[in-house]
């Protein structure tokens, strides 16, 4: 076989520019800086649009003894009201494990947990109607901190341990032993564009969902699951987001599911734009961590052994906490070398909102 010459081998092949030294703009850069970029709330609203608000738990943990929504249904502008019993499919909207309920049923597990949802002709009237609900609770003991969860062995997932060498021997034989604890607080994502979803019923009985979501495929899957329809009957669209940072990875699906359920029930377009004050209490944040360590060191400051306890405040469900606490454990040695170590990672279950993804897991 004849060998190709250099000219022949390169014929028809375009050279690839490295990009170094070139001005490579974002595909929507001009739209962003001129204000022409359309976010979900900028889309022209259909004339029959309904708006959503939710009625929320006012206690951290308890059983719902009675729920009277008669006044809510009769309130001005209200078109529809739903509870978990109105969900035709599966009300569990968990991203990985189970327990993340679309709406509370017999028990509430954190302050702000949605119990029912209202669709009205304006967001103001929907919010006003929610205040008319009459709810009676039976208070139950609440676990609110990592320390309380550790004491009561309350966990969303089993504890994991990374072990290397004989930690006890290494620490006891060290010249110095250092012990301390550190409480790393959580953090709100505070994206500029809030949580929002627009659901449009389609002519074939399905729904077209436009949402501000980092995971539009999960939105499609969970909306179909909640509605009890085939996945091809749900079109999920995300053009852009005004920030996410992990806060719209698993959290955005709830809004899409509620808006879609109202859209299918009423054959009308529905927008669920969560007020910022609701976002602050209803959606997950960065995990708090309560960390303790005991380390053996030499006179030269060299670490010879470490016992470390990392307790992540996961909230009421697992959500994405498995990987988040794992990541904290993976990074526990930082830039140091531990000849002997035991790292324990606790996924603490508390009666607080279920914490979620945030840039820089763990």
Where are each of the predicted segments found?
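Flexible, low-hydrophobicity surface segments
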Residues: 1-158, 162, 177-180
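Beta-strand segments within the central parallel beta-sheet cores of soluble alpha/beta enzyme folds
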Residues: 83-84, 233-239, 267-277, 304-309, ...
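Solvent-exposed alpha-helices and their adjacent loops that cap or buttress functional pockets
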Residues: 25, 43-48, 101-102, 107-112, ...
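Helix-loop-helix junctions that connect adjacent transmembrane helices in secondary transporters/permeases
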Residues: 147-227
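Acidic, glycine-rich active-site loops and adjacent beta-strand->loop/helix elements
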Residues: 87, 213-216, 240-244, 274-284, ...
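Glycine-rich and small/hydrophobic secondary-structure elements
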Residues: 99-126, 246-299, 356-362
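Alpha-helical support elements that line or immediately flank enzyme active sites
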Residues: 54-82, 116-136, 197-266, 323-333, ...
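Glycine-rich loop/linker segments at domain edges
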Residues: 22, 28-35, 160-197, 288-362
């Amino acid at each position: 076989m004849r060998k190709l010459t250099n000219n022949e081998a390169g014929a028809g092949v375009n050279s690839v520019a490295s990009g170094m030294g070139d001005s490579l703009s974002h595909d929507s850069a001009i739209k962003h800086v001129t204000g022409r970029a359309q976010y979900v709330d900028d889309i022209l609203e259909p004339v029959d649009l309904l708006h959503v608000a939710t009625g929320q738990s006012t206690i951290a943990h308890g059983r719902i003894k009675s729920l009277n929504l008669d006044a809510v249904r009769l309130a001005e502008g209200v078109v529809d009201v739903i509870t978990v019993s109105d969900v035709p499919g599966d009300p569990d909207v968990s991203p990985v494990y189970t327990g993340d309920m679309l709406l509370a049923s017999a028990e509430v597990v954190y302050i702000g947990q949605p119990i029912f949802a209202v669709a009205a002709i304006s967001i103001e009237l929907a919010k006003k109607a929610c205040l008319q609900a009459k709810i009676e609770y039976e208070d139950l003991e609440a676990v609110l901190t990592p320390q309380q969860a550790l004491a009561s062995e309350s966990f969303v997932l089993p504890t994991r341990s990374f072990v290397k060498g004989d930690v006890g021997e290494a620490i006891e034989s060290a010249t110095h032993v250092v012990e301390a604890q550190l409480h790393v607080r959580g953090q709100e994502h505070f994206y500029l564009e809030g949580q929002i979803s627009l659901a449009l019923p389609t002519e074939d009985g399905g729904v077209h969902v436009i949402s501000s979501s980092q995971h539009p495929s999960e939105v499609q899957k969970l909306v179909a699951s909640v509605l009890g329809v085939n996945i091809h009957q749900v079109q999920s669209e995300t053009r852009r987001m005004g920030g996410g940072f992990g806060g719209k990875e698993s959290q955005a699906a709830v809004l899409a599911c509620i808006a879609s359920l109202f859209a299918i029930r009423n054959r009308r377009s529905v927008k669920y734009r969560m007020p910022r004050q609701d976002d602050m209490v209803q959606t997950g944040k960065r995990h708090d961590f309560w960390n303790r360590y005991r380390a053996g060191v030499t006179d030269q400051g060299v670490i010879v052994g470490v016992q470390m306890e990392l307790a992540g405040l996961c909230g009421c469900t697992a959500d994405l906490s498995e990987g988040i606490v794992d990541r904290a454990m993976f990074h526990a040695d930082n830039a140091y070398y531990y000849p002997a170590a035991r790292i324990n990672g606790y996924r603490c279950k508390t009666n607080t909102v279920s914490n979620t993804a945030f840039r820089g897991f763990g």
